[in-house]
């Protein structure tokens, strides 16, 4: 009787031991699989192909990041982007093999400057393509039409604060577009710009301390003097005493 009980106890212990061995073996296999998967994942991440994808390519500069103005945006669009996507700007960007251009829905000569010119000036603060190109080129082409001075001069009180916003922008490219637009405007409106110069010269004076902007700002000031006359020179010198006149 004792032998039977002993034999039964041994069998139970053997079964328990076998079950423990199976669980231990199963756990070891799972750990091994996890280690292999992590190893594969690590090797894929550190592979030469992944490294090539992470490095920027020279062609990235030639193909700026573009937003689809008609697609879903991850964040609320700017005022200019919203107007453009709704067809409020009567022109579209045409991509060329060498350079881009604007295609107007109707001749720019018949378009009202109010509010189109101001809207394009507001777009100068955009930082993404195609808005940057559309605003800059649209502003330039609109000022080239016949009768531009008569259309632009009445808008100066509303246009100047918008240009100033571009000139005080922290983005260097936005500042450069604002500076270029200011020169284009001075060519068209001439001395009519003099009454608004003081509002703009403060931001130019601050940027003038940056070496990379010294030459383009000096050139812009010379254009302002050229088209604004002697009165503009007095205003420029009052805000930027170091400015050297083109008459010197």
Swiss-Prot record:
Location of N-acetylmethionine modifications: 1
Keywords from the UniProt entry: Acetylation, Phosphoprotein
Region (Disordered): 1-72
One Pfam family named in its UniProt record: ParcG
Entry-linked InterPro entries: ARM-like, ARM-type_fold, Parkin_co-regulated_protein
Biased composition (Polar residues): 14-29, 36-45
Protein name: PACRG-like protein
Gene expressing this chain: Pacrgl
Modified residues (Phosphoserine): 47
PANTHER family associated with the record: PACRG-LIKE PROTEIN, PARKIN COREGULATED GENE PROTEIN PARK2 COREGULATED
Phylogenetic lineage: Eukaryota, Metazoa, Chordata, Craniata, Vertebrata
């Amino acid at each position: 009787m004792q032998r039977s009980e002993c034999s039964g106890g041994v069998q139970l212990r053997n079964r328990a031991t076998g079950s423990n061995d199976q669980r231990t073996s199963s756990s070891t296999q799972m750990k091994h699989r996890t280690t292999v998967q992590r190893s594969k994942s690590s090797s894929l991440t550190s592979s030469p192909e992944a490294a090539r994808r992470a490095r920027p390519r020279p062609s990235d500069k030639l193909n700026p990041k573009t937003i689809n103005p008609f697609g879903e945006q991850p964040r609320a669009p700017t005022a200019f982007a919203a107007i453009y996507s709704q067809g409020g700007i009567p022109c579209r960007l045409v991509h060329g093999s060498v350079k881009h251009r604007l295609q107007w829905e109707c001749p720019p000569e018949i378009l009202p400057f109010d509010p189109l010119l101001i809207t394009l000036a507001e777009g100068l603060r955009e930082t993404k393509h195609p808005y940057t190109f559309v605003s800059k080129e649209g502003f330039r082409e609109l000022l080239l039409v016949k009768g531009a001075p008569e259309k632009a001069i009445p808008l100066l009180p509303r246009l100047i604060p918008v240009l100033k916003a571009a000139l005080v922008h922290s983005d260097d490219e936005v500042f450069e577009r604002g500076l270029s637009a200011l020169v284009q405007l001075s060519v068209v409106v001439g001395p009519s710009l003099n009454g608004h110069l003081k509002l703009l010269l403060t931001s130019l004076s601050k940027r003038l301390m940056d070496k990379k902007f010294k030459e383009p700002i000096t050139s812009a000031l010379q254009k302002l003097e050229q088209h604004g006359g002697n009165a503009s020179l007095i205003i420029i010198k009052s805000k930027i005493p170091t400015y050297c006149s083109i008459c010197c």
